[in-house]
Each structure stands twice: as C-alpha cells, then as structure tokens.
Amino acid sequence: MAMGAVALSVGVLAACSSGGSSTPSAGAAGPASTGPITIGASLSLHGGFSADGVAFQQGYELWAKDVNAHGGLLGRQVKLKILDDDSSPTQVVTNYQMLINSDHVDLTFGPFSSLLTAPASQVAARAGYAFVEGAGGAPSVFDTPANQADHNVFDVSLPVEDTIMPFVDYLGSLPVSARAHLSAAYPMAQDPFADPPVQLAKQKLQALGIRTDSSPAIANPFPEQPSSYGPAALAVAALHPEIVVLGSTDVPTVQEFMKVFAQKHYTPKMFIAAAGPDQGAAFTSAVGAGNAVGMMVPNGWFPLFNNAASKKMVDEYVQLHGGTKSGVNADVAEAYSVGQVAAQAIQATGGTDNTAIIKYLHSGVPLATVQGSVQFNSLGENGAAASFVFQWQRHKTGSQVDFVQVLPQGVAGTGSILATKPAWDTTGPAGG
C-alpha cells in the first residue's frame, strides 16, 4: 500500500507541475528525444468544406514532405496524424480531444474555417497547446474566453474583417457621379468567416452613397446549407443590383449564386465573394472558365506571388498533383505556411514544448512563409499580412483563364481590373 501511495503522489505532482492539464507534458519533448515529431490536425475531408479540407491536407503533407527531405526538424522526422471532421463543429472537438488526450501528439495544427477553428482552439487551450492555423481569421476565433485567457491561437493568414477593403477603396476612388447610380446587395451565409468583411463593406459603401438593395430573403444571413443558397440567389437576381458582395465560405455557395443568376439572365456589373473564387481549379472546373471571368475574391496570396519559397512550393505542387500554376488552391499555401511557422518556432525554442512555442510566437519576432511575412499581435492575428483582391481574367491567348491581382491599384504586381463582368455562358457548368 505504501508503494501505491507514493506512486499516486508522484503522478499528482507531475500533473500539478504542468498546470493541471489532462496532458501533463503539453507536447513537451525532453532533450534526448529522437523519435518523430507528431503533429495532429482535424480536416474536413467530407461534407461542405471538403474541397478546402482536401487542399489543406495537401498543403500540410507537402510541407512535411519538404521538411523530412531535408532531415526533419532538430534531426527528427515529422509525422502527421490527420482525422476527418466531416465539416462538423461537434466532430472537430472530438477529434482534437482524441489527438491530444489519446494520441498525445506533440503539436496541433488547425482545421479549415473559422466555424471549426473557434471550438477546436478551445480544446487545445485547455490542454496548454499552441494552436497554429491558417483558415480561422474571423474575429470570433480570437474573441473566445479561452484565447483571451491563454493566447494560444496563431493565424498565419490574413485577418478576415478588412479583406474586402481594397474593393471598397477602389469604388471610393471613382468620381461621385460614377457611383451615384450604383446599388449593391450583400447576401451572406451565416458564418463567422463570411459575415464580418461583408458587413464592413456594406457599412463603408453605404457611406460612399452606394444604395443598398435588399429584401426579406437576404436581410439577414441565410443558413449555411445548400437548400438556402437558391432562394437567396433568386432574391438578389430579382433586385438586379450593379454590385454583389457575397459572404461565402466555399465553392458550392458561389456556384449556386452564379447558376441562379445565369438562369435569370442577370449579370451583376461587379461580383466579389469572400471565398470560393480563390480555390483555383476547384472553382473554375465547377463554374466553367468562361463564367469565372470577372469574378473577384480577396486574399493574401496567389499562385504567381513573387516569393521564392512560394514559387518552389507551387512548382512542387503541380509536379505532384498536376494542373496549372494558376489552378493551385490558396488553401495549400495557407496550410504550408502553418507548417513553416511551426518549424521556425520548434527550431528557435529547441523542441516541442508548447509553452515555449506560445511565448516565442508572441515575442513579436518576424517569420517568413510562402504567403509572405508573419508577425503576431497579442491576440494571435497576423498583423504583417496585406490584403489584395484578385480577379479571374481571360488569358491573352487561348481559352485559359488567369488569376490576376487587381487591387489595390498602384501596388507592385497589380494588373488592370475588368470593371464590367461579361455575361454568363449559359452552356457552362454555372449556367446548367
């Protein structure tokens, strides 16, 4: 009995010394660790976010492949453990609980979407894990009590609220007479990622004198489910606004709006979506290259980004998966950047101690990724990220389309914006 009591006391001491976490080491590695560094992530390989989830998996795996080809991190190979959350906020919580409490992974990487990142990050916070992610930039992710208390979330990508501002600034640069007759509609899916940038754009465009067209069907965000997209799109088409600012999270949402607009023979002069058109070939193959022309989307990265590491990653991706450079999904770069930031933190701290990694990432140190510079503020947002607007445009020759940086104007790499969207090709996928 005495021996049993001693053993129990040691166990309690170990737990207390780690802050009482259910995973006492929180991924800490001793100085003699030589085994693989295991990184756990939950991704949407099925369900509504599956196109993004698969692209994120490809990005994580490409990063791990590159790291391991160069000897790993601190002489240790990287091993990924990825679970499928079926695009479910409930399942994502279960998955991270399993990765941390059962699999005892060293580190955790984030899922796709702010909707899943917010609850997932709270699981990581309770266990003392850093949560480096690339697709959870909504304010709701950083405003959680867990992040306010533990400051464990780090988003390597662009914060979402200001993403559409280059488009707003472009319209604001037009003569008052040119925008006086313009009207805009702001349909939004009920999603923490999709809504904030559209709500801010609406507020700013109204202040510029651009009239808001609305109806009961789009006065409030619609449920993020396929059965809701059609009625909302029909309501917009009936209003015939010159500008559509769509709060979307994925390709299917944008595709349905485009399909309904084509069926109703309504083509907005300008159409920008919060997400979807940034998905490369996943978008153009779904809607048709001709229908993609003129579609705009904000982002902090594109496949032809003038960054040596980005170019190398894009070349590798095309070699592995085929397709064209313009068709590389932005999610791949976001996921790859998560790995790059984690790698720099592991190397700088000399291991996988999550407390040390959190402290390092909050130190204000500038980090380098395929998306550009990363520097985290006190909430874990990337304050160094720049916002751009991209547009699909016809290639100079042939039937190909290119993903072109068009805003802000006057910035290096910015091309001319196509100010009027061509009419829909009703024989293409979006017109079907």
What feature does the model see in each segment?
Residues 11-15:
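C-terminal motif of bacterial Sec signal peptides marking the signal peptidase cleavage site
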Residues 18-28, 51-56, 71-146, 156, ...:
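Beta-alpha junction/loop-to-helix N-cap segments that form part of ligand/metal-binding clefts
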Residues 29-61, 83-90, 112-113, 187-196, ...:
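Extracytoplasmic "Venus flytrap"
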Residues 37, 365-432:
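Solvent-exposed, acidic/polar segments of extracytosolic/periplasmic ligand-binding ectodomains
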Residues 90-94, 139, 150-264, 304-312:
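Extracellular/periplasmic Venus flytrap/periplasmic-binding protein
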Residues 99-112, 131-134, 183-188, 240-250, ...:
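Periplasmic-binding protein-like
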Residues 150, 260-336, 413, 419-431:
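Extracellular/periplasmic periplasmic-binding protein-like sensory domains
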Residues 190, 250-256, 305-364:
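Extracellular/periplasmic ligand-binding modules, especially the Venus flytrap/periplasmic-binding
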